[in-house]
């Protein structure tokens, strides 16, 4: 049996993630007390109909129970239940904006909101440290998050590690959820060609421009060589998720092109390869 544990700071999209999995026929429970996790896991093992489940855990648990999470997780794993932990987060500025827009009450509402966000992140630290997959929802809409959850988690019947290539722009910040970050700002920039400026790295004119430069080809080959060497080692350690972020200045041309090229190359080698362009969304 596989059990997904969805956690994260308030406002990061935990409920959306659970609803996305529920739509994929997962059995979902939100805000289950941590001390009930072993009981729930044993019950699910006895019910052959429920082989995929997702549990939402957040700061509404008592602090002492949150601190016991690593021990409880070990108990569940010893019982033969394979757990995947997904932790959602976002920048403080984004979380403050979301609470302002929705006017919802924070679980730690007895203190100022900015302080509550920091305290909650600290309370959930024991869960975040155990996360198999961290998702930064700072620049992600509701619909994009639902799609991302469905693609990375909802299709776990397919074997192998889920590999995501993500392009981004440094001027908008580095993704918080990346395992590898590669800076390609040293490559020729199509932005300085007026006819290419409004296009993206997926357009044929930009692709042709970048393919003409030997430095771009060399960077692409170096990334492939590096990743081919190390991806199998990550997979051999039973790693379920890996995110490779490629960054250029604006996240529109060079990083998009290379993310697409890497996806095309590794798609033939791995069953679960995805590509996301943060700044084009």
Swiss-Prot record:
Nucleotide-binding as UniProt keyword: yes
UniProt-recorded name of the protein: Nucleotide-binding protein Noc_2797
Keyword Glycosyltransferase on entry: no
Binding annotation for ATP: 8-15
Coiled-coil regions listed: none
Family designation: Belongs to the RapZ-like family.
Example of a GO MF term: ATP binding
Entry superkingdom: Bacteria
Matches recorded under HAMAP family: RapZ_like (MF_00636)
Family matches, as InterPro entries: P-loop_NTPase, RapZ-like, RapZ-like_N, RapZ_C
Biological role: Displays ATPase and GTPase activities.
Binding site for GTP: 58-61
Keyword field: ATP-binding, GTP-binding, Nucleotide-binding
Matching Pfam families: PapZ_C, RapZ-like_N
């Amino acid at each position: 049996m596989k059990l997904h544990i969805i956690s994260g700071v308030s406002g990061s999209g935990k409920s959306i993630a659970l609803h996305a999995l529920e739509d994929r026929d997962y059995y979902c429970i939100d805000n289950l007390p941590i001390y009930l996790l072993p009981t729930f896991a044993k019950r699910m093992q006895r019910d052959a109909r429920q082989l995929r489940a997702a549990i939402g855990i957040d700061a509404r648990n008592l602090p002492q129970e949150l601190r016991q999470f690593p021990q409880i997780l070990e108990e569940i794993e010893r019982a033969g239940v394979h757990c995947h932990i997904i932790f959602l987060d976002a920048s403080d500025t984004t979380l403050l904006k979301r609470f302002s827009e929705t006017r919802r009450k924070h679980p730690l509402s007895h203190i100022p909101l900015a302080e509550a966000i920091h305290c909650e992140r600290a309370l959930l630290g024991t869960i975040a440290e155990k996360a198999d997959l961290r998702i930064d929802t700072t620049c992600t809409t509701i619909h994009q998050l639902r799609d991302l959850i469905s693609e990375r988690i909802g299709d776990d019947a397919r074997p192998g590690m889920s590999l995501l290539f993500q392009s981004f722009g440094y001027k908008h910040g580095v993704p918080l959820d990346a395992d590898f970050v590669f800076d390609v700002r040293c490559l020729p920039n199509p932005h300085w060609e007026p006819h290419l400026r409004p296009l993206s790295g997926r357009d044929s004119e930009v692709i042709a421009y970048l393919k003409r430069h030997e430095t771009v080809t060399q960077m692409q080959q170096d990334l492939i060589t590096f990743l081919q060497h190390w991806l199998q080692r990550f997979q051999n350690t039973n790693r379920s998720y890996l995110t490779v972020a490629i960054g250029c200045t604006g996240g529109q041309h060079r990083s998009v092109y290379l993310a697409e090229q890497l996806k095309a190359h590794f798609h033939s080698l791995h069953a679960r390869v995805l590509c996301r362009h943060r700044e084009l969304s």
